[in-house]
Every structure is written in C-alpha cells, then in structure tokens.
C-alpha cells in the first residue's frame, strides 16, 4: 500500500505535458487506448440528442375539466371533420389522443386552445 501512495504522490507532481507523455507511454507499452471511454460517453449522449430531434408529436387530452361543453367545442375546432358525438366520446373517455403525428407548432397550438377551454393536455 505504501508503494501505491508513493506513486500517487509522484503522479501529483507531474505537469500536464509530463502526464500526457506518461499516457502515451502506457498506451504503447500496454497496447491500450485512453480514447475508448470518451467514445463510449459520446455514444451514451446520442439517444438524448435523438430525443430532442423529435418531429412528430401526439396531443393527449388527460382531463376535460369542469367546462366539458367548451372542451368539446375546442376538440372539434382542433380536429377538423370531427362530429359532435365523436368529440363528446373523446372528451368523456380521457385520456384520449386528440391529434397524432403532428408538428410541434401544431401540437402546441392545439394544446393552447384546449387548455384555454379548461382541459388538461399533454404533448408527447
């Protein structure tokens, strides 16, 4: 254990250039690369970037709120061609997907309109 502590103390006195030279020497001697962990960390960050690049969103009505009539009207405005009965079924059957695979702008506009009517909405 004393040898390890002595090595750690000596490594602490190295300059950055000396430490870089030591890394190169150890890579050559042991046939390893210090760059491998960096590549693994970069690969782990890739899914987060892919998630940010999402282009299609679903608008989900989670709760109709107190004023169901206003929410039903808002659902009919947001989802073109939807009849009164179908809109009522969607509102009463929460959680319900109102719009699927729409752009972020369209999803946010629909969310704003539905929330203005008193509904609780998630964009996924």
Swiss-Prot record:
The keyword Ribonucleoprotein applies. InterPro entries: Ribosomal_bL12 (IPR000206), Ribosomal_bL12_C (IPR013823), Ribosomal_bL12_C/ClpS-like (IPR014719), Ribosomal_bL12_oligo (IPR008932), Ribosomal_bL12_oligo_N_sf (IPR036235). Keywords: Ribonucleoprotein, Ribosomal protein. One of its GO terms (biological process) is translation. GO terms for molecular function: mRNA binding; structural constituent of ribosome. Pfam families: Ribosomal_L12, Ribosomal_L12_N. PANTHER family: 39S RIBOSOMAL PROTEIN L12, LARGE RIBOSOMAL SUBUNIT PROTEIN BL12M. This is Large ribosomal subunit protein bL12. The lineage of its organism: Bacteria, Pseudomonadati, Verrucomicrobiota, Verrucomicrobiia, Verrucomicrobiales.
């Amino acid at each position: 254990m004393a040898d390890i502590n002595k090595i750690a103390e000596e490594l602490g006195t190295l300059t950055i250039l000396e430490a870089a030279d030591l890394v190169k020497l150890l890579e050559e001697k042991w046939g390893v690369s210090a760059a491998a962990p960096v590549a693994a960390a970069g690969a782990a960050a890739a899914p987060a970037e892919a998630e940010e690049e999402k282009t299609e969103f679903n608008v989900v009505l989670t709760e109709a709120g107190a004023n169901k009539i206003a929410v039903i009207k808002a659902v009919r405005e947001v989802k073109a061609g939807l009849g009164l009965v179908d809109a009522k079924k969607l509102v009463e059957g929460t959680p319900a997907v109102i719009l699927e695979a729409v752009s972020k702008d369209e999803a946010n506009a629909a969310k704003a309109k539905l929330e203005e009517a008193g509904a609780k909405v998630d964009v996924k």
